[in-house]
Swiss-Prot record:
Gene3D superfamilies: Rhodopsin 7-helix transmembrane proteins
Glycosylation site residues: 153
Subcellular location: Cell membrane
Annotated family: Belongs to the G-protein coupled receptor 1 family.
Signal peptide from the UniProt entry: none
Biological processes, Gene Ontology terms: glucose homeostasis; insulin secretion; ligand-gated ion channel signaling pathway; negative regulation of interleukin-1 beta production; phospholipase C-activating G protein-coupled receptor signaling pathway; positive regulation of calcium ion transport; positive regulation of cytosolic calcium ion concentration; positive regulation of insulin secretion
Major subcellular site: membrane
Chain ranges passing through the membrane: 9-31, 42-64, 80-101, 122-142, 179-200, 224-248, 257-279
Organism: Mus musculus
Name of this protein: Free fatty acid receptor 1
Length: 300
């Protein structure tokens, strides 16, 4: 399923036009709340917003690349820089969403115990670990992909591959024997594991809501808020990571579906700010999972 280059261009540009200002607003709102009281959810939201902002900045270049049918438009040394700037936030976003979901679940299932131990510095440690994991994996993969290129003067250098038609292609012409297992490991560790954590936490939040004394309307709203991270993972990041699994099983399935998955992944910069809920001046609703206990209402 190959999308027309013009449609791919329009989708990337639209994601940038919507996602860039939304993430600026989300970061601004989170910073405003952090000045009053820094919480673990705010730490995750700030990292997710900065991650999505970096991803959004790369989308115009991705749009130009799509319009040129995959040809790399910049000087060759910029390819690995673009690869890190584009794919690091694409993978890190799943980890931050899982961390947000875990905080909601712990706040709902163990309100008093979690309130006693939650500290922003622990959340900073989690965020640093997520960034380190993503960057180390991407750096290792890029290093392995380019390490032999200096000995093979025919095509490849710094992630660039020159196909037969002479057009430079950044990363997409990566040696399939190296690309398939590397992308599969990325997806298992940086998508499917966060997806399982997010799904488990979502079910836990739903169970806590069922036992709560909230009105039906507030239960529905809280359930929607808790499920936002899971929805973003499935709709935006799911297709791209599913294509990595499919291409590992059957190499003929990877190409066109991977391009479509990259487009849906780009739209995570639009949905993530809506999930975190710090776009306005009011409370960050996106970080709340509410449960009613005998002593009152606990919010995370």
């Amino acid at each position: 399923m190959d999308l027309p280059p013009q449609l791919s261009f329009a989708l990337y540009v639209s994601a940038f036009a919507l996602g860039f200002p939304l993430n600026l607003l989300a970061i601004r709102g989170a910073v405003s709340h952090a000045k009053l009281r820094l919480t673990p959810s705010l730490v995750y939201t700030l990292h997710l917003g900065c991650s999505d902002l970096l991803l959004a900045i790369t989308l115009p270049l991705k749009a130009v690349e799509a319009l040129a049918s995959g040809a790399w438009p910049l000087p060759l040394p910029f390819c690995p820089v673009f690869a890190l700037a584009h794919f690091a936030p694409l993978y890190a976003g799943g980890g931050f969403l899982a961390a947000l979901s875990a905080g909601r679940y712990l706040g709902a299932a163990f309100p008093f115990g979690y309130q006693a131990i939650r500290r922003p510095r622990y959340s900073w440690g989690v965020c640093v670990a997520i960034w380190a994991l993503v960057l180390c994996h991407l750096g290792l993969a890029l290093g392995l992909e380019t390490s032999g290129s200096w000995l093979d003067n025919s095509t490849s250098s710094l992630g660039i591959n020159i196909p037969v038609n002479g057009s430079p292609v950044c990363l997409e012409a990566w040696d399939p024997d190296s690309a398939r297992p590397a992308r599969l490991s990325f997806s298992i560790l940086l998508f499917f594991l966060p997806l399982v954590i997010t799904a488990f936490c979502y079910v836990g939040c739903l169970r806590a809501l069922v036992r709560s004394g909230l009105s039906h309307k507030r239960k529905l709203r809280a359930a929607w808020v808790a499920g936002g991270a899971l929805l973003t993972l499935l709709l935006c990041l799911g297709p791209y990571n599913a294509s990595n699994v499919a291409s590992f099983i059957n190499p003929d399935l990877g190409g066109s579906w991977r391009k479509l998955g990259l487009i849906t992944g780009a739209w995570s910069v639009v949905l993530n700010p809506l999930v975190t809920g710090y776009l306005g001046t009011g409370p960050g609703r996106g970080t709340i999972c509410v449960t009613r206990t005998q002593r009152g209402t606990i919010q995370k």
